[in-house]
Amino acid sequence: MITDTIYQQFGHLLNRSERLRTTVLVLANTAGCLLMLSPALSLIAATSSAIYIYNHNQGPLDWFMFECMLGVTAFSAYLTWQLLNIRPEQPEGIRLKPEQSPEIFEMLERRANHFRIKPVTHINLSTGTELKIVGTPVWAVPIYHRHTLCTGTPLLFFLGRGQFRLGLAGAVAVAANKRICLSGWLDQAANDWPLIISALKSNDSLLPRLLLKPIDWLATHIEHLSIRLRADWRQQQSRWVLDNSDEQNTTDYLASHLVATAFLDKQYWPMIFKAADRSPTPVVKAFSHLPLLLHKTLNKKHAERWLLEAQTFGKQQQTGVRDLLAELRIDHLAWPGLPAESAFDALFSNKEILKQLDTYWQNTIETQWRVAHTRYKNHEFRFNQLKKSAQEQGLRGESALKFVKLAPQFVDRQGAIAIYKEMYNNNADDAKVCFACGLALLRSSSVDAGITALQHAATLDPALAKRARVLVSEHRNAWVDEEPEHQTTTMEHATA
């Protein structure tokens, strides 16, 4: 009991004192480094001891100690060799060659020289929307790093050439600052430990079995203690952009970055993965078709809604956006639209690199795609069973709930609405089914029927009344999406 109280008080003190938190982080990261380097340190100590004893041998006992030191040296050398063969995973993506886009390499070299840092020679084109220099440990110790410029290919279609140059300069500036300050090393180490743990887990040798548990324990506490530190460093690039550019350029860059991320997560990838319903292997050319699909499916209304969500909703990754805008005294973000000439078109003379990225993405996503296809086929089989049962004898309880849940995947909106109403009428005495049908009707834009079903569910079970009121209120205040059938049809035509 006393120990728990002391632990809680120390935790509160850590939350209040940044200096204490930094001190604990330094100690924890140093302990982790020493633990990972323990085989090499033991090798040095045992070898030195063996040499000393050999040179000062005075009897049988010294010979025994010498032989013991030789054994410790051999064992330490074995563990050190295993340590050298544990390599954390490098950033995802395909390696860009200088001849594919010489201008990007020239930009990066000029910026590295300007900030007086070691040249970054590796550039990866990834499938995300990042634009940053990523340091990854060469070995399983967060000390020596290989630095790579990671550029999200989709982001290049949302930025103009000038915006890309501005973002690249900010990325190099952050990398330069991170190398010369203590908080930068702590942030880098906090990002390194998950990679090191993943490398230890994927290696079945003796050293990972000895070190995994203590390193995992340390990494868990380091991650918790460095939450604020990492959040602050995530915003350093945007702060640099504002300090070295005008407010309009900064807001345009931030808005384009947020819209690109939201477009991929909320619209593009769900639309692409619909093809898993038809094909067991990923045959869609997600990046070769991206420019066409981007102009066909993205509109101003969606972009403004995503920006509003980023500035108002409480997700952890979006909280930093609100804090940054408040710190920079920016009232709101407005999307400037897609550039007349994207950074990709300006920096790449041909689109051959997109075909390489298609192949890389298809190989990377193959397992996940196969799982999605299998899940769809299982759902399709279950839906057909429930549909047959509904026609023959009707559905009740859990079967009705499952039928309502699966309906949007296999019938159009009008067909789904008919199913929701049928299940509601057949289960008018079941609060859970009525609530599920009401929610599904609201999402299908059948507002009056949805509200009626939710109110009836609240009558059957008063515990659902508050949730029903919240859902109705949220729906009345929500932005209206385009019908998903339009997006699916667009993708099918474009990828045919």
Feature roles, as predicted:
Residues N177-L212, D252-L258:
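Post-HEXXH active-site segment of zinc metalloproteases
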Residues M1-R16, L206-R230, D243, E247-D448, ...:
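Cytosolic-facing loops and C-terminal tails of multi-pass membrane proteins
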Residues I44-V72, S205:
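Hydrophobic alpha-helical transmembrane segments
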Residues L61-Q90, E109:
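Transmembrane alpha-helices and immediately adjacent membrane-cytoplasm interface residues
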Residues L27-I51:
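Canonical alpha-helical transmembrane segments of integral membrane proteins
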Residues Y78-L96, H224-W233:
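Transmembrane-cytosolic junction motif
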Residues L83-D192:
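Peri-catalytic and regulatory segments of divalent metal-dependent proteins
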